[in-house]
Structure formats: C-alpha cells, structure tokens
C-alpha cells in the first residue's frame, strides 16, 4: 500500500511539474493604436527560416502554436483595402520577393492545418514586398511603427500599411 501511495505521489508531482513548463515559443500581444496582434514568437535558433522551416508558396500561421489573430478596434485600410473593425486570423504566404497577407474570418484555428477547410472565410488577400536586411532578428517580431505593421524575422522584413478610417 505504501508503494502504491508513493508511486501515486511521484506521478502526481511529475505531471504537475510538466504542466508548468514554459512554452518554447512565448506568446505576445503586439499593440498599436487601435490594433493588436496575438501570436507565438518562435526563435531562429540557427535555422534557415523562409524557404526552409517556413516553405515558400505555402500558407503559414505567422507564428507558433495557435494561428495568429489580429484585432482592429475601428474600420481600417489594411494594405490599401477596407476592413471592418473586428478580430481576424492572420496568415501569410511567403515568397522570395513578396508575401500574400490573408485575413480570415474563422477564429480558433490551430496553425494553418485547417486553412483549406476555412479559406472560403477569407476577408482579404494582399501582396506586399519583402525587404532583405543586414540586421538579424532572432525571434519573430511584429510591431506597429508609424501607420504600418512591421513583421521581422531572420533577415526578412515585411511592412503592411495600416490606415484607420
């Protein structure tokens, strides 16, 4: 009986310790004026990112774990296209010279695995240019400088113009 209790106690402690482990890719909410993005922030860790870990020409969740979401508090022009206030799932299709940015109305997706099932809920597709930089960004970063959404990772930078109505 004592062995059974000891085994149960050790198993409980082990499971409890595992459940408190920190996520490998921490999550962050990037906040700008009237806009926020919730995303997992994976690290480069010496890997080739675009064209490697993240293949060209394939839908990508733009982060880690759950699909990235973007929330607009007011109606907006996103890369020159009108978008109603609300929360959307944010996907990209990266290519060497440009990215396709996708806003999708289906929330609660895990990664991009179900994208094909919900692509009929796409709100927007826009193409934006890619800029290669000398600056190495170790961890995927989304920020909101001066009327834009800036995506940086590895030596890649993508800027999406944002203008509120």
Identify the meaning behind each predicted range.
Residues 1-22:
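Bacterial Sec-dependent N-terminal signal peptides
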Residues 6, 93, 154:
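Residue-level marker of positions within ordered structural domains that often coincide
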């Amino acid at each position: 009986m004592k062995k059974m209790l000891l085994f149960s106690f050790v198993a409980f402690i082990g499971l409890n310790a595992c459940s408190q482990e920190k996520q490998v890719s921490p999550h962050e909410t990037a906040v700008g004026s009237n806009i926020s993005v919730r995303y997992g922030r994976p690290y480069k860790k010496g890997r080739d990112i675009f064209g490697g870990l993240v293949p060209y020409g394939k839908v990508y969740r733009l982060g880690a774990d759950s699909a990235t979401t973007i929330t607009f508090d007011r109606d907006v022009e996103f890369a020159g296209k009108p978008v109603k206030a609300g929360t959307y799932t944010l996907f990209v299709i990266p290519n060497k010279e440009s990215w396709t940015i996708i806003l999708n109305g289906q929330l609660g997706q895990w990664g991009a695995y179900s994208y094909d099932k919900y692509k009929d809920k796409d709100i927007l597709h826009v193409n934006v240019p890619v800029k290669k930089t000398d600056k190495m960004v170790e961890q995927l970063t989304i920020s909101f400088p001066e009327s834009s959404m800036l995506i940086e990772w590895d030596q890649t930078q993508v800027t999406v113009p944002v203008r509120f109505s």
